[in-house]
UniProtKB/Swiss-Prot annotation:
Its main location: cytoplasm. The gene is uvrB. This is UvrABC system protein B. Keywords: ATP-binding, Cytoplasm, DNA damage, DNA excision, DNA repair, Excision nuclease, Helicase, Hydrolase, Nucleotide-binding, SOS response. It comes from Salmonella paratyphi B (strain ATCC BAA-1250 / SPB7). CDD domains: DEXHc_UvrB (cd17916), SF2_C_UvrB (cd18790).
Amino acid sequence: MSKPFKLNSAFKPSGDQPDAIRRLEEGLEDGLAHQTLLGVTGSGKTFTIANVIADLQRPTMVLAPNKTLAAQLYGEMKEFFPENAVEYFVSYYDYYQPEAYVPSSDTFIEKDASVNEHIEQMRLSATKALLERRDVVVVASVSAIYGLGDPDLYLKMMLHLTVGMLIDQRAILRRLAELQYTRNDQAFQRGTFRVRGEVIDIFPAESDDIALRVELFDEEVERLSLFDPLTGQVESTVPRYTIYPKTHYVTPRERILQAMEEIKDELADRRKVLLANNKLLEEQRLSQRTQFDLEMMNELGYCSGIENYSRFLSGRGPGEPPPTLFDYLPADGLLVVDESHVTIPQIGGMYRGDRARKETLVEYGFRLPSALDNRPLKFEEFEALAPQTIYVSATPGNYELEKSGDEVVDQVVRPTGLLDPIIEVRPVATQVDDLLSEIRQRAAINERVLVTTLTKRMAEDLTEYLEEHGERVRYLHSDIDTVERMEIIRDLRLGEFDVLVGINLLREGLDMPEVSLVAILDADKEGFLRSERSLIQTIGRAARNVNGKAILYGDKITPSMAKAIGETERRREKQQKYNEEHGITPQGLNKKVVDILALGQNIAKTKAKGKGKGRSTAKAGIVELDMTPKALQQKIHELEGQMMQHAQNLEFEEAAQIRDQLHQLRELFIAAS
């Protein structure tokens, strides 16, 4: 099923890219465990990495610091590798409240979560691709270091079907039930099967557009065919097919029974400890909760919060790392850590926060001590599991630089010829009035401005002041959710307003070529928000505009400011020299606004073509591409209802058109999920 990686791009590497690609590939072939790609904003870092993947033909995981950047990378990689498996693996929770206990108020908070089904399907698709083929790029968030089902058990639970295989219908149905598929003869949806005489239709959990029909004759598999679950039209017949479990957390029955005995042993030991310490309430609470879970596991094969018993279910010893997405990545896989100066500290912090919450639950009798082993990876475990790694950042952290030694690959020259912003330092005393006049100059020529302040209060006051003086301004702060944040950035690019004020939310993130001025207030206040890395990242937001400029308001030049200005000047001089040598005139980027959200859009269109003769492709069109994420979500719910109505009325042509449109809208919505 694997194909070689085939890079699809109208451009050839240029600027610093050819040298960066060569050095990274040589380092990987020489067996270097760590390399750093120091690439400035707009230098084509993703294109460089895509070239390395295509040349070396190795399965790759790309780690991004948040869902927004993961979505952007997923869209870019899907464009570079349309014929290969580009997968998306982020947390599938739209909302997640972990269970917790607050001793001071004696409050227990139950676990509460809302799962995004589309992202769950994409996660299952990602692990399937890693197990089945080598031409895989998985774009993941830090969700990749959290516990996942054991790959060995996952592989053991698969159902392999081949034409001519001797197996009766009841055996297939029993195996499907073990894989947590449910029978539903009325509503055929993902993770279900239906039975009609000797025919079993199965809708694989990792698929959203193809189902399997198993035709039996006299306890023998006579035919296996793939069909469109909506129209019922057969796409092709296959000699064999593998059904993957509905969830990553399936466990064979014998393993569950063995785990139950181990849980009972731990419960008995823990009860003795609690009684010895005169913790009678905690002992009763723990016994009651655990016995209930054991009964559920015995009857149903799972229970609410079964992940807290994952150590027993996967057969690990106390303190051993949980199985994660890294266990699915082949031994010769490649890891790319994007925006590594943010992602690496995130990985280090996940374990500590999780541990503190669970220790309280164990101490007060809500969970057994083994629940502490249901956790994300510790940083040292991540280091041990990580394959050969490339760290990508415009401002690499000390960790990456230390690990890479001399292997820091510079990518400072942009193929577009764009120069780093001109930097000016101006006094603090007149910063607000000076900023107002700069904003008016930019607004007059239809360009945008980003302003970063030190405190929330100052951001609010500045926004109010600018509004009073007639400027079109918005304020971006930590209380705004992902969906609304993307709406604000989109509106800024479309020119709905001219100025965006924020604190620490304007650094690493989406490309905004329309921004020509970045103003940093109180730049001379040394600290986290005004460190060398923060300043370089913030200045870089204006690096995609031909008129890019950064104004640092400060009464003195701090060491961080001096380093940031020096590094920006170095990059600017190198680009200027390259432009002169090659006769390049800097060109601004004309990136469509819909690119922020348009993930896999072309792929969705391609899928829609030719799925049955005579079908007209859905006009997913222009209207939807310009919609806000909230409107997209509303539109998706509306269309799903229409699609099911058409299917019930046997109007399969119309239902299929809407289904193709839903494909595209769901891809667009991923960025904000």
